[in-house]
Regions:
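Catalytic domains of carbohydrate-active enzymes that cleave complex glycans
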Residues: 219-377
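Generic recognition of cysteine residues
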Residues: 3, 36-41, 166, 177, ...
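Alpha-helical scaffolding segments of alpha/beta enzyme cores, especially the outer helices
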Residues: 5, 9, 58-69, 144-151, ...
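Alpha-helix N-cap and loop-to-helix initiation/capping positions
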Residues: 48-58, 140-144, 172-180, 285, ...
Length: 377
């Protein structure tokens, strides 16, 4: 009753005529860890494919029905939404689908109606943290998560998705999420997802090194039109953002992808690789790789020399290249001080600090501020 009343109160704060886009409400909490393990909840869980979410769905339906009944009252006509949607977070312990696979007919089945949406418009908001976002959604290593989705999608339509694709503890490292998004956005479209939230660098936007500004652009384009070719989007981005420097910048991007693929293979990385801190830790890079990147950056800077006669254009192009330059610079600062001269190291540190400050870069990781690093340079 309390939850229903809070939703009803919110609807009165935002009348339909003034806020027509207010069409859904989220019932849930951020991270669903350590769910209840009492005897009664365990009994319900065991009945429904070992899914603890089976204890939550009936509660959600009760809340939704109360709100729907409230909206039908004549005095609440101004606040009524047609087909109002109630979402719940399917993440961690609550991601397991409460449906078993019936080998005899090749279909997912529910033990009873308590875990079905029935007449209520409730949908899961999936947070697929155990999908490997460096691989295609159709890759064999993503089979378990894909089957979990398929089980849910048998009974729930118009769902939402919270997706990932970076090193959350290292905002300066390159992460190859392009194999995933190339196929995933089409998959989500074909399965009637209505909202996708990509949690890339959630604490930093617009000045992301490691081509994460491009990653955000590509995701936005594919989520709007999943039939687009990712190679075309990459080329379009490079040509517009870097003009004559597109070729060396694209080579830098390819080198990043090759490093990521090699590191995954040699380190046997899985979906949990997002926890790694490559640029801030030893053993992930060879100095030859960094040196090669710096050489390509020198080519990129040389390509835009022609724009020095147009100071504003040159400044913008150089800054875009500078932001990507932060990636190898961070590797040197953290790992290879002894491999460069004292003067070169000081030059790298000074430029790194200036580019970060000029672009208001605030974080080294999702929860780590950059202040301490900049003060140490």
């Amino acid at each position: 009753t309390y939850c229903a009343e809070k939703i009803e109160q919110s609807l009165t704060f935002y009348p339909r005529e003034q806020f027509p886009l207010y069409a859904s409400v989220q019932l849930g909490m951020a991270d669903n860890y350590d769910m209840c393990s009492c005897d009664e909840c365990t009994k319900v869980k065991n009945k429904h494919n070992g899914a603890i979410v089976a204890t939550i769905i009936p509660f959600l339906k009760t809340v939704a029905r109360k709100v729907n009944e409230w909206m039908e009252l004549p005095e609440n006509a101004d606040y009524k939404r047609e087909n109002f949607q109630y979402t719940f977070f399917a993440y961690q312990d609550t991601l397991e689908a409460p449906f078993a696979y019936d080998e005899s007919n090749g279909k997912y089945v529910a033990a009873d109606n308590s875990v079905l949406p029935e007449e209520v418009n409730i949908v899961p908001y999936f947070a697929l943290n155990k999908i490997d976002h460096a691989l295609s959604i159709y890759d064999e290593k993503n089979t378990n998560m894909r089957e979990t989705l398929n089980a849910w999608l048998t009974f729930y339509k118009n769902t939402w998705g919270w997706i990932y694709g970076c090193f959350y503890q290292d905002y300066f490292a390159f992460y190859d999420c392009y194999n995933y998004y190339a196929d995933a956005c089409r998959y989500y479209y074909e399965h009637d997802f209505k909202l996708l939230n990509p949690q890339l660098h959630s604490s930093q936007r617009g000045a992301d090194t490691g081509f994460f500004t491009m990653a955000a652009y590509i995701f936005a384009k594919l989520s709007w039109n999943s039939s687009l070719e990712i190679t075309d989007l990459i080329n379009d981005y490079m040509n517009v953002m870097f003009k004559e420097a597109a070729e060396p910048m694209n080579k830098i991007f390819v080198e990043g992808r090759l490093w990521h693929a090699r590191s995954r293979y040699e380190g046997n990385w899985t979906w949990s690789a997002w926890q790694k801190t490559p640029t801030m830790s030893g053993g992930y890079f060879k100095f030859g790789y960094v040196n090669k990147l710096f050489g390509l950056f020198d080519e990129a800077y040389a390509k835009i020399e022609k724009y020095k006669g147009s100071p504003e254009v040159y400044k913008e192009l150089k800054n875009r290249i500078d932001i990507e330059w932060l990636y190898p610079a961070m590797i040197v600062i953290s790992n290879f001080q002894k491999e460069v001269s004292v003067d070169k190291y000081s030059e790298i540190c000074a430029k790194f600090k200036k580019v970060c400050q000029d672009n208001n870069i605030t974080h080294v990781s999702e929860r780590g501020l950059i202040n301490g690093l900049l003060q140490s340079l």
